[in-house]
């Protein structure tokens, strides 16, 4: 005979953590999760700050530029601009010594840029944690979150680590389309970025991933099992079928004939499709960290010396070096007004059209 002592309840008493856990992760249709406590507020503030800045806030006091819809910019030319170089690496808190609680002054000083950059970084981290949390909840492997580390690495290296290595937030990209293009030209002129091997690996990763994606999608479409009499993909197979929807064997034979080699199992194929772009993004991020420290790569000095001595000797490299000098000369004076740079007209390189 068994005697049970104690109070019997249908459900064990829940402590505060369990109540919160249920509220965040189970009692709703759209998953929030503990990661959502970081993701949603930070994403809201980052996007809200960007929309506010591009709509109303000028860059006259930091860059001498118009940068808002209010001043006549459009979607491509509006931006949330970086603070002035004189503010160095200040966090530019609204209540800090620079703005002293004055919201208008805070916007004029570029406070919205640090606001958007830092909240944006934590929002991206929150999104990666969301993928970890949801994967763990449904017992998936965490490769989605691992893959998303690539974009996070690029964002953090470009918007945070690079300016931290330079003299201030001023040299980070402003948050806008044309502003990012200007930053790319700046990277080329001042760092010769396109000849950096880490940039090359990044390009290979991103373009290689696009190629793999196109090949994979086309191959699956080409080798679908036909389950109906429909004329196109969306009618010729049943979306709820339990069986495999395409023939890996047929795909393998096809690419073996095309290239001579082909993936023989899906796990290796899909891991490769994960590995290529993520590795490319991480390599780019490492390269930008190097630029933050002003490391140089691939300076072919022997060609530069020979080109200087022999007017008839020229390579694509020496032409690009001259182009970079032109970018620096034209950009520096207008891009860094705080330096008060003045170049004599005769030293500014000009094309035939000018």
From Swiss-Prot:
Modified residues (Phosphothreonine): 2
Binding site residues for pheophytin a: 131, 144
UniProt-annotated location(s): Plastid, Chloroplast thylakoid membrane
Keywords per UniProt: Acetylation, Chlorophyll, Chloroplast, Chromophore, Electron transport, Iron, Magnesium, Membrane, Metal-binding, Oxidoreductase, Phosphoprotein, Photosynthesis, Photosystem II, Plastid, Thylakoid, Transmembrane, Transmembrane helix, Transport
Residues reported in the UniProt entry to bind a plastoquinone: 216, 263
Recorded GO CC terms: chloroplast thylakoid membrane; photosystem II
Gene3D superfamilies (UniProt xref): Photosystem II protein D1-like
Keyword Transmembrane helix applies: yes
Binding site for chlorophyll a ChlzD2: 119
Transmembrane segments: 42-62, 126-142, 154-167, 209-229, 280-296
Pfam families: Photo_RC (PF00124)
Residue numbers bearing the N-acetylthreonine modification: 2
Described purpose of this protein according to its UniProt entry: Photosystem II (PSII) is a light-driven water:plastoquinone oxidoreductase that uses light energy to abstract electrons from H(2)O, generating O(2) and a proton gradient subsequently used for ATP formation. It consists of a core antenna complex that captures photons, and an electron transfer chain that converts photonic excitation into a charge separation. The D1/D2 (PsbA/PsbD) reaction center heterodimer binds P680, the primary electron donor of PSII as well as several subsequent electron acceptors. D2 is needed for assembly of a stable PSII complex.
Note: 2 of the reaction center chlorophylls (ChlD1 and ChlD2) are entirely coordinated by water.
Stored PANTHER family: PHOTOSYSTEM II D2 PROTEIN, PHOTOSYSTEM II PROTEIN D1
Oligomer and partners: PSII is composed of 1 copy each of membrane proteins PsbA, PsbB, PsbC, PsbD, PsbE, PsbF, PsbH, PsbI, PsbJ, PsbK, PsbL, PsbM, PsbT, PsbX, PsbY, PsbZ, Psb30/Ycf12, at least 3 peripheral proteins of the oxygen-evolving complex and a large number of cofactors. It forms dimeric complexes.
Xref: NCBIfam families: psbD (TIGR01152)
HAMAP family per the UniProt record, alphabetical: PSII_PsbD_D2 (MF_01383)
Family: Belongs to the reaction center PufL/M/PsbA/D family.
Name of this chain's protein: Photosystem II D2 protein
Species the sequence originates in: Piper cenocladum
Gene name, Swiss-Prot/TrEMBL: psbD
């Amino acid at each position: 005979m068994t005697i049970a002592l104690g109070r019997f309840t249908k459900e064990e008493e829940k402590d505060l953590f369990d109540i919160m856990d249920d509220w965040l992760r189970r009692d709703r249709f759209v998953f929030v999760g503990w990661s959502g406590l970081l993701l949603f507020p930070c994403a809201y503030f980052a996007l809200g700050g960007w929309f506010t800045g591009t709509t109303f806030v000028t860059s006259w006091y930091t860059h001498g530029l118009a940068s808002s819809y209010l001043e006549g910019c459009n979607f491509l030319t509006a931006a949330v601009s970086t603070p002035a170089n004189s503010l160095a690496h200040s966090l530019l808190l609204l209540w800090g010594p620079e703005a002293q609680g004055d919201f208008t002054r805070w916007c004029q000083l570029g406070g919205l840029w640090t606001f958007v950059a830092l909240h944006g970084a934590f929002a991206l981290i929150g999104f990666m944690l969301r993928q970890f949390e949801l994967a763990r909840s449904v017992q998936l492997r965490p490769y989605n979150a691992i893959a998303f580390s690539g974009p996070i690495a690029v964002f953090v290296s470009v918007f945070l680590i690079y300016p931290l290595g330079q003299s201030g937030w001023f040299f980070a990209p402003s948050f806008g389309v044309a502003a990012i293009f200007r930053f790319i030209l700046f990277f080329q002129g001042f760092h010769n970025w396109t000849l950096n091997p880490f940039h090359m690996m990044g390009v290979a990763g991103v373009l290689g991933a696009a190629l793999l994606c196109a090949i994979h999608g086309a191959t699956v479409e080409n080798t679908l099992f036909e389950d109906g009499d429909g004329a196109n993909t969306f009618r010729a197979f049943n979306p709820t079928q339990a069986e495999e929807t395409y023939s890996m064997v047929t795909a393998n034979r096809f690419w073996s004939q095309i290239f001579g080699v082909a993936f023989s199992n899906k796990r290796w194929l899909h891991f490769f499709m994960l590995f290529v772009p993520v590795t490319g993004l991480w390599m780019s991020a490492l390269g930008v960290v190097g630029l933050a420290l002003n490391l140089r790569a691939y300076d072919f000095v022997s060609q530069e010396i020979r080109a200087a001595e022999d007017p008839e000797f020229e390579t694509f490299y020496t032409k690009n070096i001259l182009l970079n000098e032109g970018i620096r000369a034209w950009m520096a004076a207008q891009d860094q007004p705080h330096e008060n740079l003045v170049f004599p007209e005769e030293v500014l390189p000009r094309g035939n059209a000018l």
